[in-house]
Amino acid sequence: MLRIFCFVISWCLIAFAQPDLSGFVSILGAACGYGFFWYSLEPLKKPSLPLRTLFVSCFFWIFTIEGIHFSWMLSDQYIGKLIYLVWLTLITILSVLFSGFSCLLVAIVRQKRTAFLWSLPGVWVAIEMLRFYGIFSGMSFDYLGWPMTASAYGRQFGGFLGWAGQSFAVIAVNMSFYCLLLKKPHAKMLWVLTLLLPYTFGAIHYEYLKHAFQQDKRALRVAVVQPAHPPIRPKLKSPIVVWEQLLQLVSPIQQPIDLLIFPEVVVPFGKHRQVYPYESCAHLLSSFAPLPEGKAFLSNSDCATALSQHFQCPVIIGLERWVKKENVLYWYNSAEVISHKGISVGYDKRILVPGGEYIPGGKFGSLICRQLFPKYALGCKRLPGRRSGVVQVRGLPRIGITICYEETFGYRLQSYKRQGAELLVNLTNDGWYPESRLPKVHFLHGMLRNQEFGMPCVRACQTGVTAAVDSLGRILKILPYDTRETKAPSGVLETSLPLFNYKTLYGYCGDYPMILIAFCAVSYLGGGFLGYRLLAKKEIR
């Protein structure tokens, strides 16, 4: 009966240990949820389950939980029914990894190899790195330590060891709690210590920084546009209609501002393609700035330059970029920083979305897609960018730009800190998964970079979370976003963003300390098991 209770209570705790669902359940689940589950697999009193039954039970438990955690993927209005197969594949892979780890833990407990037990947090980090670095472009959502970030102190701990340190801590805490349930000596003290230590480090650092924050008076006045356009729009009567809607949004902006930001691919036709009739643009932009003479048609660059001249500040805008090489047309998802003189500095997205921006498996994957799923085959070759994401604009701090879910990969953004970035700007569009949890899930994963690197961030989104967040992870201003109950309205976020920056261990070292810990843990466990087997063979002889 106790095993069933632990199984059920652990499922409830971990299934809803999501910061977007419940902060309290997230913290509680991170403290004891997995410990209850492992106790249900291997309790103090026997009988023990056969290994196969153990794996199946574990797989069922985590498979149903991962299904809830990634339920936002099942919004198929724009993505299509193939997303169900992608969802099933993803949660199956994640479930197999966790089930294998749990069976390893139980096997060590059964053999009473306590010395090996404490290598397991590092082993889990090594396993989780497979998903961060190895599953397609990397799966950064819903890592095991994410529930810790429901607390400001838990998020601040990420400034020391990043996402991997948070996952390490959650595994260590729950193993200690499991040992407490097994009535192991010193387990209670160990559980309290592993539970409080990460939050204590985070709390001390956070409270110290709050005091230092007050001494820095620098701020940036930003205006962030949320057009709230759906991903697939009805056929336009005229190309200029998109700019007409955007200009209606920006015209009430209170001046002066230092930076005007638009979301990912906010207008079609790329940067330089001249598709907008001059007369139509002159009618719309006459109250903003003079337009270049001698052109029959204007481009997105011309329109953005006019806005930059009007507001006397740079404009960051998400655009497509097309490049023809050897008779092959390549597509880049880009961000352009355009000054009032028309000078542009660009960045191309580096981490592409599997399926949406590239087909995994190279030529073989593309062939299979064309044969079995022709509807989802991509019309042109899409490439990851190589241009630096850190841009320097006169009169502004260095800006680190990310597009879409790039902001959720801490190790990718470490180079931004080294290059002197003081502000993160993310351009995104979560509208591909309407009426789902994705906007908030994406936002909460992205804002972790603030405290990992000690930088504020601004997010510009079509229908997701458009927000300004300071370097301590405090939300300064946020626009309404798309949920199951409400549609995101169009609007402009205007705020003064404090530029307080600080150095962090994670910003300096990145994932390398945890990679070293993971390597040592795997080596110790592997070497220990090998030595144990060799010793057993000698005894048999």
From Swiss-Prot:
EC number(s) on file: 2.3.1.269
Annotated InterPro entries: Apolipo_AcylTrfase, C-N_Hydrolase, C-N_Hydrolase_sf, LNT_N
UniProt-listed GO biological process terms: lipoprotein biosynthetic process
Membrane protein topology class: Multi-pass membrane protein
CDD domains: ALP_N-acyl_transferase (cd07571)
Alphabetized Pfam families for the sequence: CN_hydrolase (PF00795), LNT_N (PF20154)
Name assigned to this protein: Apolipoprotein N-acyltransferase
Gene that this polypeptide is encoded by: lnt
